[in-house]
Amino acid sequence: MTKNNEVGWNLDNSYATLPQSFYTEIPPTPVSSPELVKLNHSLAISLGFNPEELKKEAEIAIFAGNALPEGAHPLAQAYAGHQFGHFNMLGDGRALLIGEQITPSGKRFDIQLKGSGPTPYSRRGDGRAALGPMLREYIISEAMYALDIPTTRSLAVVTTGEPTYRETKLPGAILTRVASSHIRVGTFQYAAARGSIEDLQSLADYTIKRHYPEIEAHENRYTALLQEVIKKQASLIAKWQLVGFIHGVMNTDNITISGETIDYGPCAFMDNYDQGTVFSSIDTQGRYAYGNQPYMAAWDLARLAESLIPILHEDEEEALKIAQDEISKFSVQYEKQWFIGMKKKLGLFSNEEQDQSLIEQLFKMMEKYKADYTNTFRSLTLDTLENTPLFDSPEFKEWYKLWQSRLEKQEESKENAYEMMKNNNPSIIPRNHRVEEALEAAVTNGDYSVMEKLLEALANPYAYSTDQEEYCVPPAPTNRPYRTFCGT
């Protein structure tokens, strides 16, 4: 173990206080010649680290799993999951939680190495990760953070000096992922499937203490836990939909109890507005299509409610009723959050009867004319309506008049309305073709400058600066249809 207080390590291991069935203690598998290729300076500082120290050989060895910091307690977490509707016992097959960093402000964050070698949950996998998918997770998770969407984050990426074999031979890498925790709906499914009410209660109590301490004294804290998670997920999915983010693999093991977005495998951002948009190569039925995401979140949360039934009430029928009642509230909460967000995207402060219809009409036209989702709202925000099939259409011109007269009805000025739009309509998203361009340069040519430039632009998505304009251009028809892969 390395001991260096100048670096800023301040690890605790509260997860290891849970019953041992929830994890397996296992060290990372060392790699031959690690090199640091990306460090997140601002995140490092917020976690209490000295970024300059993290660039030193001793700390790079930690990011690679070749050494452990003082206080580390590496473990692979066990969990289950419905993967495309099919239930499996799973677990961290290529990741290890090395500990929980306590920040200078007293907050607790999991520090996880992703690609750190095989574990008892690897299911015949090699436990490793390729450089491309790890850089991709870094780019997208940091873009999500800048968009103000709850997310896990990326502290560092190191190359391992060893190949990883997928369809082809690829350079290996390890990502250091930071999360409020890695407790998932699947963690509760795992506890329930094992059949021990004591273990299930231990997990629920731990989760409440860690994420929702304000409900500890609630008369039925387990019902309150379900309510809190539903609230968090309703807000999260609304935020995804509002920026056109498609997760791609909303299995129950990828739904966090903290309400953070996790697992950036086959995710992507929508170009042309289409409710049926799917990018993931393995989602052949469109289960996790853009328009299905709210329904799939409700489905996943119903699996959480099922898992909690043994502790919701001593009477099983009453417990089932509580679970059903709570799950039925998700769609109302989601729709409310989405509607509030959409009104902000259109500069609407007050409530008017026509608002729902105004929004619906816009989306019908966007779908009809295959309008770019992000750029449509960007153009409305800037009030610069370029020559596009949507903006040139007679029905849009009619809609635009209605919208303008709706803005004029408000007490707030139009300037204030456009300012609110600017704060809610990103000018830039991680366009799929731009992300691929950055990954190609880094992985194939060892040129990280394309990625650095992209990350710099993505860090301020609401800036509307001229430097970002090149990143606002939608992909050429030759870059479509875009397909994503999970990288495992």
From Swiss-Prot:
Known EC number: 2.7.7.-, 2.7.7.108
Cofactor(s), names only, from the UniProt record: Mg(2+); Mn(2+)
Chain positions recorded as Mg(2+) binding sites: N254, D263
Enzyme class: transferase
Active-site residues annotated for this sequence: D253 (proton acceptor)
Residue numbers binding ATP: G91, G93, R94, K114, D126, G127, R177, R184, D263
Reactions performed catalytically: L-seryl-[protein] + ATP = 3-O-(5'-adenylyl)-L-seryl-[protein] + diphosphate; L-threonyl-[protein] + ATP = 3-O-(5'-adenylyl)-L-threonyl-[protein] + diphosphate; L-tyrosyl-[protein] + ATP = O-(5'-adenylyl)-L-tyrosyl-[protein] + diphosphate; L-histidyl-[protein] + UTP = N(tele)-(5'-uridylyl)-L-histidyl-[protein] + diphosphate
GO molecular function, one term: magnesium ion binding
One Pfam family it belongs to: SelO
Keyword Nucleotidyltransferase: yes
Record key words, sorted: ATP-binding, Magnesium, Manganese, Metal-binding, Nucleotide-binding, Nucleotidyltransferase, Transferase
InterPro entries: SelO (IPR003846)
Family under the similarity heading: Belongs to the SELO family.
Function (record text): Nucleotidyltransferase involved in the post-translational modification of proteins. It can catalyze the addition of adenosine monophosphate (AMP) or uridine monophosphate (UMP) to a protein, resulting in modifications known as AMPylation and UMPylation.
Protein name stated in the entry: Protein nucleotidyltransferase YdiU
